[in-house]
Amino acid sequence: MKIAWNEIKYQPKKFILIEILIVIMMFMVIFLSGLTNGLGRIIMAQIDTFGDVHYILSKDSEGVIPYSTLTSSELTEIEDLHLEEQTGLVIQRSTFMKEDEEGSQDVTFFAMDTYKNLTIKAEDGYVAANLSDNEVILDESYKAKGIHVGDTIKDKTSDILLKVVAFAKDAKYGHSSVAFISSKTLEEMRQKKNPNYTWQPQAIITSQAVTADDLSEQLMVSNKQQIINKIPGYTATNMILKTMTWVLLIASAAILGVFFYILALQKLKQFGVLKAIGMSMGQITRIQLSQVGILSVIGISIGLGLAMALMPFLPVSMPFYMRAEDNAVIS
């Protein structure tokens, strides 16, 4: 190790090119991994944020929340289970616009009858449980579109006005930003088109473990990962993006392997001298491996550091998310 480090220290020009290459390759792979995770999270981030809860849906929905329809009798059946910390959820696509302004924004409304039991990453210390009727918590990506706390937005389907009271981080679902509203607000919005509408959740979320044996044949229960996998487009998108990352990682490793091989060929005469003075082939091999290890650790550390340093400067609208476990595997 000492000999390997001394050679690097006293002949840095010999190793500078390969070190730069390692840094660039590491930065590229880490950055692509972050984009891959980010693109995956814009499909399922809010479901992931809710944590390890269970979702009770109608069986014909096949695990897709917006496709679920719970009848009054099924809701009564669920109530009879006396589940702990249960929350009703409705997911609805829509568009909205700022009051007195033109142009519309796509949005996915998450309407719930209570916000006490689920995690929402509201900013500035806002407590989601305090959300009142005709108020809305928007995903932070809307900040870049000129929307601020205190603004009023109008749902274009119902013309209902909603006051923005907070922003939330990682509030994404199905390639769309999420807006959180109360069940009463959704009821008012839908009654504009259907006066007879009353609140009827698509899914019941509970922290209590529920099995299929606890439910009738018309109902099903899914965990967090099962719900995520059933979000339209998630599985295919995630598989393609992960494959791209691994292809780049393997290609980078192959390129670096070629450079290290060329570096070893350039040192054949040096190896001969070392053998002549009594150094074994095993010792020479350990020196080379130590050198590769030192160069790799330095390059990986710099590349990872650059990627992490860039994170705070990326626009909120860019889907970028780094995970420690992915960084460890790539490194």
Predicted regions and their residues:
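Alpha-helical transmembrane segments of integral membrane proteins
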Residues: 18-28, 241-258, 295-299, 303, ...
